[in-house]
Amino acid sequence: MSQAGVKTKQAGKIVQIVGPVMDVAFQPGSMPNIYNALIVKGRNGAGQEVSVVCEVQQLLGDGLVRAVSMSATDGLMRGMEVTDTGRALSVPVGPTTLGRIFNVLGEPVDNMGPVGNEKTLPIHREAPAFVDLDTKLSIFETGIKVVDLLAPYRRGGKIGLFGGAGVGKTVLIMELINNIAKAHGGVSVFGGVGERTREGNDLYMEMCESKVINKADVKSSKVALVYGQMNEPPGARMRVGLTALTMAEYFRDVNNQDVLLFIDNIFRFVQAGSEVSALLGRMPSAVGYQPTLATEMGGLQERITSTKDGSITSIQAVYVPADDLTDPAPATTFAHLDATTVLSRNLAAKGIYPAVDPLDSTSTMLQPWILGDDHYGTAQRVKQTLQRYKELQDIIAILGLDELSEEDRMIVARARKIERFLSQPFFVAEVFTGAPGKYVPLAESIQGFKLILSGELDSLPESAFYLVGNIEEAIAKAASIQAAAAAAAAA
């Protein structure tokens, strides 16, 4: 944590340590405020230097405060001196954070030296005032056809990303980071909350490989990474989301940029709060969760919004414990979401990427008075066609296509073209596939699907629609396939 400009206020002593929670005694009349950062410095039993940052959670009275540690409490002893910094945890913000990896305290952990930035902000801040909010409903164009057409993101909204292992969450996240930088001139902040350290490392390596992070010129990178992985104490996992959000708020409020904030995984934020709550002695609520669950979630989510200066659009991976959507943690999260993007293993198995399920993914923005009748009508017709195809699949599997009516055969043919046209080559996957990435503007996406639905392209082969950008590319690909087939027949 940057201590620049922090005036040391008061000193206290540790009187009790219970795991990551400690009680500290201060002189009466010199108590720290709630959320103040405390620093414990001293030597452990082996004579080694220890330095731990804690956050005040409760004022117990008689000079006693209860604080939660942001790192391991190994080596701490009763009687050690504790210093009140007089302010909340503060983290570096601004362009120098791009391309770097930070921990919950805002300390770089990527072995690339100090950030060289004296500008810091406290992680606990008020949500923007109502008069500062931008209440105009507008969609956030991603350049990804399936998202923009069927489950569009709201500018300044919150999106839940649901998907198991290996269906393409990471690649979709990296493509969104890449596209917001190119199309919106925006930046991204990634908050790794309570997930695997290996996944955090893999994400960093893949970002370097796909040039989302440019190690040769770090300042040209498009993303800042903040990690508090599952090996960290619950205090760090509970606060790392706020650290990432604070960095994103600076880009929105000071640089007036559109920012993407990724939180992976929002459930772990709740889980960490539950662990801390029990250690603080609070009475548990439903299913053992903390009684302050809705308040903690609201405190984070209400800061993620559009203002008149810029926007923070948040994409949050949501783990659903035991696939129970009524569990208090995912149920509380759903109340804040504007859209859901569901990744399907069946589509991934077919090789259709991004493997976004067009029928399960939803958005509150899919309304004719927001999108216009053209977009809304096209999206509804695409969904109806795909739904009918899904209903017919059992019949096809048992009896075959020949037993279907003429109309149903036509629906199946168009649905298969639509399914393939929903796939798209990604910029960040170029290094793996060799196919150049495509950014498809919304108007071109709508035009393409309207042409497929109208029947004008019924004569084109299905394969022409697979992994292309706009419809002109599909038509050109069909022409080259037919030319190659004619040449082969002539030979």
Swiss-Prot record:
Pfam assignment, any one: ATP-synt_ab_N
Signal peptide positions on this chain: none
Record keywords, A-Z: ATP synthesis, ATP-binding, CF(1), Chloroplast, Hydrogen ion transport, Ion transport, Membrane, Nucleotide-binding, Plastid, Thylakoid, Translocase, Transport
Compartments it resides in: Plastid, Chloroplast thylakoid membrane
Cellular component, GO, one term: mitochondrion
Disulfide bonds: none
SMART domains on file: AAA
Predominant place of localization: plastid
Bilayer topology: Peripheral membrane protein
Catalytic reaction list: ATP + H2O + 4 H(+)(in) = ADP + phosphate + 5 H(+)(out)
Class of the enzyme per the UniProt entry, highest EC level: translocase
Binding site for ATP: G163, G164, A165, G166, V167, G168, K169, T170
Domain of life of the source: Eukaryota
GO molecular function: ATP binding; ATP hydrolysis activity; proton-transporting ATP synthase activity, rotational mechanism
EC number: 7.1.2.2
Listed PANTHER family: ATP SYNTHASE, ATP SYNTHASE SUBUNIT BETA, MITOCHONDRIAL
Subunit structure: F-type ATPases have 2 components, CF(1) - the catalytic core - and CF(0) - the membrane proton channel. CF(1) has five subunits: alpha(3), beta(3), gamma(1), delta(1), epsilon(1). CF(0) has four main subunits: a(1), b(1), b'(1) and c(9-12).
Record family assignment: Belongs to the ATPase alpha/beta chains family.
Primary role: Produces ATP from ADP in the presence of a proton gradient across the membrane. The catalytic sites are hosted primarily by the beta subunits.
HAMAP family linked: ATP_synth_beta_bact
Protein name per its UniProtKB record: ATP synthase subunit beta, chloroplastic
